[in-house]
Design a protein with these regions (language model features):
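Canonical Radical SAM [4Fe-4S] cluster-binding loop centered on the CxxxCxxC motif
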Residues: 1-17
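Residue-level signal for well-ordered alpha-helical positions
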Residues: 3-6, 107, 244, 253-254
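Short, histidine-centered active-site or binding-site loop motifs used for metal coordination
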Residues: 4-7, 98-100, 168
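Radical SAM enzyme [4Fe-4S]-AdoMet core and its adjacent flexible, acidic
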Residues: 11-14, 106, 110-222, 233
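Radical SAM/AdoMet-radical enzyme domain recognition
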Residues: 21-35, 45-165
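A short, conserved beta-strand element in the Rossmann-like catalytic core
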Residues: 42
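Flexible mid-to-C-terminal extensions adjoining Fe-S/redox cofactors in radical SAM and related proteins
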Residues: 216-270
């Protein structure tokens, strides 16, 4: 319902694979991290492992951030193939949309996806991988954020990071506006409850893609500068904000923004 990079009918897997190999070959050895995203990277099948092995050979000190829905790893043999690439310097970012399978499957528009993602998460843990669990904040997911936090603590306490992520308003999100759009200022109570509970339980929790001005002040310390440089921007009035240097800014690709955007003025006590 909210995919920011909707699928198209072109079969460009092989062309993009070759292009990516060339990009890796031209990357500086000092590159701190490299992201593998899509679409869905596991659609490459075993070529995904060839790509990862190529990165590890050419850029041995570079961290790999693999963004995937995790479903392919429900097959333990596929997870073990990734393990053969080595578990070091790989972080898998995997979304979970609800503690209820029906809500998760509705958002993905794929029946059974919740069960596959959960099994994939457990298989990746068995294989020794670090996982960043991602919860994209929309009208559906925000209804059960405290319950989601409890579910994560009880069922997925092994994840390395938990990231609550502001939604990029582009792609299918525009088409499904009435189903998924909610202004961030309208879910702050639920978000604060979920984040603070996970933090209290000792999980490493962050808030991505949300400006400080739309967050409750108690959440500022969890906010991360998370938006990629190529699609990051700030409004003109952000120059007046005392927290601009700490703030993630906005998606340049988003067609809609929160009505709560405003510069934050800090008054120092004399």
């Amino acid at each position: 319902l909210m995919c920011c990079q909707p699928p198209n009918n072109s079969n460009d897997l092989e062309r993009n694979y070759i292009k990516n190999i060339k990009l890796i070959d031209s990357a500086p050895a000092s590159l701190p991290s490299i992201g593998i995203t899509g679409g869905e990277p596991t659609l490459l099948g075993d070529k995904l492992f060839s790509l990862i092995n190529h990165i590890k050979a050419k850029l041995p000190e570079t961290e790999i951030h693999l963004l995937t829905n995790g479903r392919a790893f429900a097959d333990i043999n596929y997870a073990k193939k990734l393990m053969q690439c080595g578990t070091e310097k790989i972080l898998l970012g995997i979304p979970i949309h609800s503690d209820c399978s029906s809500d998760h499957d509705y958002i993905t528009q794929s029946k059974g996806s919740f069960d596959e993602t959960m099994l994939g998460l457990y298989n990746l843990e068995r294989c020794g991988f670090d996982v960043e669990l991602r919860i994209v904040l929309n009208r559906i997911t925000c209804q059960r954020l405290p319950q989601m936090a409890n579910f994560i603590y009880r069922n997925l306490p092994f994840v390395r990071y938990v990231a609550f992520m502001g939604m990029e308003y582009t792609g299918f999100t525009i088409k499904n506006h009435d189903l998924v759009w909610i202004d961030p200022i309208d879910y702050q109570e639920q978000l604060e409850s979920a984040v603070c509970e996970l933090n209290r339980w000792g999980l490493n929790v962050s808030v991505f893609n949300l400006t400080h001005c739309v967050l409750n002040e108690n959440l500022w310390k969890f906010a991360v500068k998370s938006i990629s440089d190529w699609k990051n921007e700030y409004a003109e009035f952000c120059d007046e904000c005392a927290l601009k240097e700490k703030c993630c800014g906005l998606f340049a690709t988003s067609r809609k923004q929160s009505k709560g955007l405003q510069p934050i003025k800090v008054i120092l006590c004399e």
